[in-house]
Amino acid sequence: MMKSIILIVLDGLGDRPGSDLQNRTPLQAAFRPNLNWLASHGINGIMHPISPGIRCGSDTSHMSLLGYDPKVYYPGRGPFEALGLGMDIRPGDLAFRANFATNRDGVIVDRRAGRENKGNEELADAISLDMGEYSFRVKSGVEHRAALVVSGPDLSDMIGDSDPHREGLPPEKIRPTDPSGDRTAEVMNAYLEEARRILSDHRVNKERVKNGRLPGNELLVRSAGKVPAIPSFTEKNRMKGACVVGSPWLKGLCRLLRMDVFDVPGATGTVGSNYRGKIEKAVDLTSSHDFVLVNIKATDVAGHDGNYPLKRDVIEDIDRAMEPLKSIGDHAVICVTGDHSTPCSFKDHSGDPVPIVFYTDGVMNDGVHLFDELSSASGSLRITSYNVMDILMQLAGRSDKFGS
């Protein structure tokens, strides 16, 4: 019998011991009976995202977990962000991640314009322009975030960013990284100058300044990319795929792979999200889909904040939400892992491996009874993210035999 698959990715799960938790990791310090139950009934190990020592992004790691080599298919983050916001991207279009930022006297004083969102749709509409042969479409996202899609002849993604990536610096002039990007850099610089003029004079920003708030008078762009020619998830893995995720960029990746994207009320993509709702939705989807991806972002948020106790508490909240997984092993394969480590001491992605567990009825436990960085390392698996899909398909009775 072929089984459905649920892959649960706890973003930035892995960590390092911290004095705030008596020299334990947040995972070790957390009360986690359901994760430990999965470990006690499953196959355990450690997983290197991409390969040992690589500090990967969530985007490249998720691509590899889904069976795609990011060295071949990764288009940059821009297309994911735009697709995640529901924008159309045609072949040849160029997509960017974008922020509304605050420019004061030619210097970026806040890359996020106070994380203000009210009025950003108006700002985005105001700088969605046609300039000669080129059209520029901007869509507002969560808080200060946005995406930009450029259409026109001979666009190249061989260009840099306008985002200086920290405050106290002027916005960068976009420069080509290859001669093929010369014309695109010129077009982008002309557009960003016009956008700056429009934003500085816009009613929304004048109102913000009047009320002592930061104006979003600069559009910072980065991560230019084009949509690649890429096989759908169904074409590649012979499964009908779904995702239950909150982050717009990850929705964009799933849409690029032609997976079905589902929203859950209260699933915010941050701390306090509706974790139980996500798990219950994934369980429900096993009746209509062969594969379900769940991403929970809150662990990564706590790691980037350097907050050991918060990351421990988030893991405990997530663990409570996982109770329904223990009763579906007869018809589903469950995998729980991270996409990378985000140690609280480092406040960024590291190259450390992450724990991983595979569970379904009938698998032989490898003697591991706790789910954490150290205990899982005594399990039977030492794998990379490229191995995960093969293991899942084999356990689900969906793999082909290699040879005769």
Swiss-Prot record:
Entry keyword set: Glycolysis, Isomerase
Disulphide bridges, residue numbers: none
GO molecular function annotation: metal ion binding; phosphoglycerate mutase activity
GO BP terms: glycolytic process
Catalysed reaction, written as an equation: (2R)-2-phosphoglycerate = (2R)-3-phosphoglycerate
EC number(s) per entry: 5.4.2.12
Keyword set includes Isomerase: yes
Pathway: Carbohydrate degradation; glycolysis; pyruvate from D-glyceraldehyde 3-phosphate: step 3/5
Region annotation (Disordered) ranges: 155-183
Pfam families named in the record: Metalloenzyme, PhosphMutase
Biased composition (Basic and acidic residues): 162-183
InterPro entries documented for this protein: Alkaline_phosphatase_core_sf, ApgAM_prokaryotes, Metalloenzyme, Pglycerate_mutase_ApgM, Pglycerate_mutase_ApgM_sf
Enzyme class: isomerase
Function description: Catalyzes the interconversion of 2-phosphoglycerate and 3-phosphoglycerate.
HAMAP family: ApgM_A
Stated name of the protein: 2,3-bisphosphoglycerate-independent phosphoglycerate mutase
The encoding gene: apgM
